[in-house]
């Protein structure tokens, strides 16, 4: 959706049908996670190209994600700065599942408070 909104003015319309296809879960961590930290100078220290975490295309990111998954330290996932708003994002690998507990899950639109905040924060409009 990020790239579709480039250059638009005012609220950006998103179809309700698209949102109805998305599921969401609230998850709690029940054991410490080992994350490869790609924030700040982490990518530079690990010799990972900037585009692995910041390009619009995800191809290079997928390759580096696989390389990190295969690493001997067996990280549970990665933490990186969002290219959209600079906030920290976490992507977890399958091996992290035993360290998590799903508190609730369901269609995205069932999480009304969270969806309302996202719509407001990013000037989105459901059509």
Swiss-Prot record:
The keyword Nucleotidyltransferase applies. InterPro entries: RES_dom. GO terms for molecular function: nucleotidyltransferase activity. Keywords: NAD, Nucleotidyltransferase, Plasmid, Toxin-antitoxin system, Transferase. Its EC number is 2.4.2.-. It is an enzyme of class 2 (transferase). Pfam families: RES. Belongs to the MbcT/ParT/Res family. Probable toxic component of a type II toxin-antitoxin (TA) system. It is not known which gene encodes its antitoxin. This is Probable toxin y4kH. It comes from Sinorhizobium fredii (strain NBRC 101917 / NGR234). The lineage of its organism: Bacteria, Pseudomonadati, Pseudomonadota, Alphaproteobacteria, Hyphomicrobiales.
């Amino acid at each position: 959706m990020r790239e579709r909104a480039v250059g638009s003015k005012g609220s950006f319309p998103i179809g309700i049908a698209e949102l109805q296809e998305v599921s969401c879960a609230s998850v709690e961590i029940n054991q410490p996670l080992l994350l490869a930290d790609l924030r700040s100078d982490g990518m530079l220290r690990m010799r990972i190209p900037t585009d692995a975490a910041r390009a619009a295309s995800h191809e290079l990111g997928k390759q580096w994600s696989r390389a990190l998954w295969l690493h001997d330290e067996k990280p549970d996932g990665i933490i990186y700065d969002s290219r959209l708003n600079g906030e920290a994002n976490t992507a977890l690998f399958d091996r992290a599942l035993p360290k998590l507990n799903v508190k609730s899950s369901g269609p995205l639109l069932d999480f009304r408070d969270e969806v309302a905040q996202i719509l407001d924060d990013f000037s989105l409009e459901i059509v």
